[in-house]
C-alpha cells in the first residue's frame, strides 16, 4: 500500500529529495537536489521501529559475500560532480557504491547490501562531502593536525621540522634526515600527510636525496632564494621524479621580475602559492601568473575574503612570520610592499571566475589552518552578495558556484599533487575520507569526520552522561584515531622513488607509503575542475589595479561575514 506525504514531511523523515532546496548555514548560498538515487517507499532508515531490521531492510548476506561494512543512509552528497541524494557504502575503508541500500531479498533496485555485519551512519537531513585537502602547511606544531581534522580537513601537505625559524617562514623540510624524522612522527596522526622538501638549490644532488628520502613535492621559497637558476633546477628534477613543485616567488624582485620567473618555468607545470601576493611573491604583479596554462594557482586564507579588517591585520602578521624587524626601514618596506587592497579585492573576483583554482591555509605562518573551509564559503557568499548569480546558475540555486568552490579544497589540490585517484571526492574506489554536516552548520562545525572508513572525530558530550549529547559538547578524537586503527586508515604520500625503495622498512613506520603520480606534463590549468579560467591579467604598477581581459576587477571589503561569530559564542 502506497501513501502520499508532503515534501516537508518527507524531508523531515528521509532528507531532501529531487527539487528540494537547502541553504548552506547562514550564507546566501542555496543548493538544489539534482537527483535522488534512493527509491521512494523503499528508503532505509535505522532505529526502533524503522526499516533496517532483520528480514526487512537488513539481509542475511555476509560481509564476505558482499554486504557493506558501513552504510551512510539518505545523505545529500555535495561534490564537484553533483548535488545528489543517495546511500553510500563503505567497505574495507573504501567507497564501494553510491546508490540505493537495503535488502535485495525483499526490496527492488538495491545497489548496496545491508547485512548483519553492516553498521549505519544516519545521513538523513545531512550533507556529505569529501574530506578537505590543505596543501600549504607549515608543520610548526603537531597540535595543528587535530585542529585541521576537527574542521573537516583529512589530508595535509607541507614542510617543516617543528618550531624552527626556517619552518616559521617556509613550508620546506630540508634534507633526508629531517624528512625521515617527520615521516616517522606521522604514525601518530589520523590524517593523510605529505612532506615538501626544500627546492632551493642550483644543482640536482640535494633535491634528489630529499625526493628519494620521502618528499612528495618540493617547495621553492623566497626566504631560501627563489632565483631563476633554482627554479629551473627544481623543475628539472621534479620532471625526472614526477613530483609537484610549489613556489613562493621573489617579493623584492632582486633576482628578477615576474616575467623572469615565468621564463624560468619554461612552460612546465607548477603550483603557485598565495597567487595574489600578500603571502609573498613578486610585488605588485605576481597575480598575473594566474593567466598561464602551466600555473596551478592557489590562495592562502588570511586574504579570504577581502574584509574591512584584512589590511590591518596583515602587517604585524607578516613581520612575525618572516623574521622581520619593524625598526629596520627596509624590513618594514618589504612588508608593506606585499599588502595591497587592490590585488586582494581582485582575488575575490578571480576565485568567483574560476581563475584561482585552490584554497589552502599557510598554517601559523600567515594562515589559519582550521579556517580553510570556512573562508572558502565566506568568499563564495561574499561574491554571491556582490556579483549575483553566476551565468551557469539559475534564480533557484547556486549549484555551479557551490561545485566551483568545493573543488578548491577537495579535488583540485588532489589533482595538483597527484593523489586524485585515492582522495579528493565522493566517488567509488576512493578512500572513504568523508565529512558529514548539518546544513545549519555547513562549513563551520562537522557532525562527523570519517577517515579511511572509520570515524576519527566528532562532537561528543559528557562521557559520563547517560546519553551522548549532554553539554559540554567538545570535538574529540574517536576510536579510529587510536592504535593500529589510525595507521591503517591513513597514508603518507611520497615520491615513486621513495615508495619503490626500502624507506618504510628503514624508517620503521606502520603507515603505508603511497606514491604521487601524474603531476608534471600530464596536468595543467585545464585540469583544475570548474576552476580552469585563464583571463589575460594586467596590474597597474602605480595604482595596483587589476584587469582581466581589460575589465577592472574590484569589490568593496565585507563589513559582516557569515560562518563567523554566531557559530563561536561557546
Curated annotation (Swiss-Prot):
Residues holding substrate: 221
Active-site residues, as the UniProt record annotates them: 322 (proton donor)
Compartments in which it is found: Cytoplasm
Cofactor section: Ni cation
Main location: cytoplasm
Sequence positions that bind Ni(2+) 2: 219, 248, 274
GO BP terms, alphabetized: urea catabolic process
Keyword match Metal-binding: yes
The protein's assembly and partners: Heterotrimer of UreA (gamma), UreB (beta) and UreC (alpha) subunits. Three heterotrimers associate to form the active enzyme.
UniProt record similarity statement: Belongs to the metallo-dependent hydrolases superfamily. Urease alpha subunit family.
Protein's recorded name: Urease subunit alpha
The gene coding this protein: ureC
Amino acid at each position: 500500500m502506497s501513501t502520499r506525504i508532503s515534501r516537508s514531511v518527507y524531508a523531515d523523515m528521509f532528507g531532501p529529495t529531487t527539487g528540494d532546496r537547502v541553504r548552506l548555514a547562514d550564507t546566501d548560498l542555496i543548493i538544489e537536489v539534482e537527483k535522488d538515487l534512493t527509491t521512494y517507499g523503499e528508503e532505509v532508515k535505522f532505529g526502533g521501529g524503522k526499516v533496517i531490521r532483520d528480514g526487512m531492510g537488513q539481509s542475511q548476506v555476509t560481509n564476505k559475500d558482499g554486504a557493506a561494512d558501513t552504510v551512510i543512509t539518505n545523505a545529500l552528497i555535495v561534490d564537484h560532480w553533483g548535488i545528489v541524494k543517495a546511500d553510500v557504502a563503505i567497505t574495507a575503508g573504501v567507497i564501494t557504491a553510491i546508490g540505493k541500500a537495503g535488502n535485495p531479498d525483499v526490496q527492488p533496485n538495491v545497489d548496496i547490501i545491508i547485512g548483519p555485519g553492516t553498521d549505519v551512519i544516519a545521513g538523513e537531513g545531512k550533507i556529505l562531502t569529501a574530506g578537505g585537502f590543505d596543501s600549504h602547511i607549515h608543520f610548526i606544531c603537531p597540535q595543528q593536525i587535530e585542529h585541521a581534522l576537527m574542521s573537516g580537513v583529512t589530508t595535509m601537505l607541507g614542510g617543516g621540522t617543528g618550531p624552527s625559524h626556517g619552518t616559521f617562514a617556509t613550508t620546506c623540510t630540508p634534507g633526508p634526515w629531517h624528512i625521515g624524522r617527520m615521516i616517522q612522527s606521522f604514525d601518530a596522526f589520523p590524517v593523510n600527510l605529505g612532506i615538501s622538501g626544500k627546492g632551493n638549490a642550483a644543482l640536482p644532488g640535494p633535491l634528489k636525496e630529499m625526493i628519494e628520502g620521502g618528499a612528495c613535492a618540493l617547495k621553492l621559497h623566497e626566504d631560501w632564494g627563489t632565483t631563476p637558476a633554482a627554479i629551473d633546477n627544481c623543475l628539472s628534477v621534479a620532471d625526472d621524479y614526477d613530483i609537484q613543485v610549489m613556489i613562493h616567488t621573489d617579493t623584492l624582485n632582486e633576482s628578477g621580475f615576474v616575467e623572469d620567473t615565468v621564463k624560468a618555468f619554461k612552460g612546465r607545470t607548477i603550483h603557485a602559492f598565495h597567487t595574489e601576493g600578500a603571502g609573498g611573491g613578486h610585488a605588485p604583479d605576481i597575480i598575473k601568473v594566474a593567466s598561464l596554462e602551466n600555473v596551478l594557482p592557489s590562495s592562502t586564507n588570511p586574504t579570504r575574503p577581502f574584509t574591512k579588517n584584512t589590511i590591518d591585520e596583515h602587517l604585524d602578521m607578516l613581520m612575525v612570520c618572516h623574521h622581520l624587524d619593524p625598526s629596520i626601514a627596509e624590513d618594514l618596506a618589504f612588508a608593506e610592499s606585499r599588502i595591497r587592497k587592490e590585488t586582494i579585492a581582485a582575488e575575490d573576483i578571480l576565485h568567483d571566475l574560476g581563475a584561482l583554482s585552490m584554497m589552502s591555509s599557510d598554517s601559523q605562518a600567515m594562515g589559519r589552518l582550521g579556517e580553510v573551509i570556512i573562508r572558502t564559503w565566506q568568499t563564495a557568499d561574499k561574491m554571491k552578495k556582490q556579483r549575483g548569480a553566476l551565468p551557469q546558475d539559475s534564480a533557484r540555486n547556486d549549484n555551479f558556484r557551490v561545485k566551483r568552490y568545493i573543488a578548491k579544497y577537495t579535488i583540485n589540490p588532489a589533482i595538483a599533487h597527484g593523489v586524485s585517484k585515492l582522495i579528493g571526492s565522493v566517488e567509488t574506489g576512493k578512500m572513504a575520507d568523508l565529512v558529514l554536516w548539518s546544513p545549519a552548520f555547513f562549513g563551520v562545525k562537522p557532525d562527523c569526520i570519517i577517515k579511511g572508513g572509520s570515524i576519527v572525530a566528532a562532537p561528543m558530550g559528557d562521557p559520563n552522561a547517560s546519553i551522548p549529547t549532554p553539554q559540554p559538547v567538545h570535538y574529540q578524537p574517536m576510536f579510529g584515531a587510536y592504535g593500529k586503527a589510525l595507521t591503517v586508515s591513513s597514508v603518507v604520500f611520497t615520491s615513486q622513488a621513495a615508495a619503490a625503495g626500502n624507506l618504510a622498512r628503514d624508517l620503521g613506520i606502520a603507515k603505508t607509503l603511497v606514491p604521487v603520480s601524474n603531476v608534471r606534463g600530464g596536468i595543467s590549468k585545464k585540469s583544475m575542475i570548474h576552476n580552469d579560467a585563464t583571463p589575460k591579467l594586467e596590474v597597474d604598477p602605480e595604482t595596483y589595479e587589476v584587469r582581466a581581459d581589460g575589465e577592472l576587477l574590484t569589490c568593496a571589503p565585507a563589513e559582516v561575514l557569515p560562518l563567523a561569530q554566531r557559530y563561536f559564542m561557546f
